């Protein structure tokens, strides 16, 4: 059975009715068929697929935000399946639990803002320690709005950033915040800096396994740099 109670209505996921192993088998078959029909190649050997957790794995996503006048309520989430309507959801099983449990409190918070009908989206990015939410705003926040956002982020240990136009307008709500996020792989002593809107692998658990697999296949010598 699906791990999310909104599966079937929400368009964010499409394969939760399959077991994890069945999803992998389906995707592998589709990949092999693409290689044969489009690439005109057939691999001699196919490694076993890399597996990761089935829930709370998506450390980067973009939520739509919409104030619905008829409900007098701000909705935050993904579109309904094959629809422009926004799913009325209070949790999401594929994002980190920290983000999932904040969906409903965020809706209540945004409903109090003076520009609640001028916020089209939130883009979030998480690493091992920080949870950043980039709030797209079409009008300036009032002083009261800023105070409310600061109180919320301090209490819930997240960081609000704002975006007024393009990506070059993104900035932390509090100027003292570090504007770069660190992704670390302790096993291989790797540390990368990135921005909340940078393109990254949304599943950090898969990253770890991918690097282990690549290193095992390459078998680099001590004097070789990868």
What is the meaning of each model-derived region?
Residues 1-226:
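Accessory RNA-recognition modules of RNA-modification enzymes
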